[in-house]
């Protein structure tokens, strides 16, 4: 590969990195199971593909806007100093244009290939993350990721709306599951990178509050998440199979966070990133259970 080819490949990698692909992957993980539950069976594959592509562009646009807005503070944090706007791989102007292009294309995509409600929800999701979280909340309140987490819940509503053309109670419960899951997911991260957040004056809970208090709140939110997953049983008429899965997964999730809390109370060293990673697994398995239940209920 010549110099031009390598340069082009680096540019592509930089633009992909700008979209925060790992976050996109996590958001899309909730999409297919939600569509299966809404359909009470396997939806049209083309419909699923359309929603996944639109969702990837929407989430990618939100990530790109966030990288543009946070480019100054990203340079001060070890976790983010390799992002393309910090390294100079992309210019701020090019990044902003790319973010707007993805945003507009994602909304038009949903409008043309899915429906108007998912297009509207997609636009709201980008606005919530790029403006409400990144500009209004992030530097102002320790509750930033709680309310900023609203954006991360939107793929569930988009997926449900794509199938039904409406927002129903099961979708709202799933929305609440992701909303309540967000603090137990991100606050352990803020504990691990507390020094980074202090250097940038971002008031993340894990950076400015005592660890004992932070982990206690993580534990309380974990109980709330589990309660919400169980609430789905009567609301969405889930089968006993889902009830068993959600109860076992919930007990495991709460137990692991309780173990972390005990270590903090006793003054021991903690590995907060263990809970960060574990929370990803927990949410993945909960939504996998939702998808399985949607297929099983069709067969009963």
Swiss-Prot record:
Question: What InterPro entries does the record tag this protein with?
Answer: Protohaem_IX_farnesylTrfase (IPR006369), UbiA_prenyltransferase (IPR000537), UbiA_prenylTrfase_CS (IPR030470), UbiA_sf (IPR044878)
Which EC number applies?
2.5.1.141
- Which keywords are on file for this protein? Cell membrane, Heme biosynthesis, Membrane, Transferase, Transmembrane, Transmembrane helix
**Any one GO BP annotation for this protein:** heme O biosynthetic process
Q: Where in the cell is it found?
A: Cell membrane
**Entry's transmembrane regions:** 21-43, 45-65, 94-114, 117-137, 145-167, 171-193, 213-233, 235-255, 272-292
Q: Please indicate if the UniProt record lists Lipid metabolism as a keyword.
A: no
Known catalysed reaction(s)?
heme b + (2E,6E)-farnesyl diphosphate + H2O = Fe(II)-heme o + diphosphate
Which Pfam families does the UniProt entry name for this protein?
Answer: UbiA
**PANTHER family for the chain:** 4-HYDROXYBENZOATE SOLANESYLTRANSFERASE, PROTOHEME IX FARNESYLTRANSFERASE, MITOCHONDRIAL
Q: Hey, which family's this protein in?
A: Belongs to the UbiA prenyltransferase family. Protoheme IX farnesyltransferase subfamily.
- Miscellaneous note of the record: Carbon 2 of the heme B porphyrin ring is defined according to the Fischer nomenclature.
Query: In UniProt terms, what function does this protein have?
Result: Converts heme B (protoheme IX) to heme O by substitution of the vinyl group on carbon 2 of heme B porphyrin ring with a hydroxyethyl farnesyl side group.
Name of this protein: Protoheme IX farnesyltransferase
According to its UniProt entry, this protein's organism is Tropheryma whipplei (strain Twist)
| Name of the gene this protein is made from | ctaB
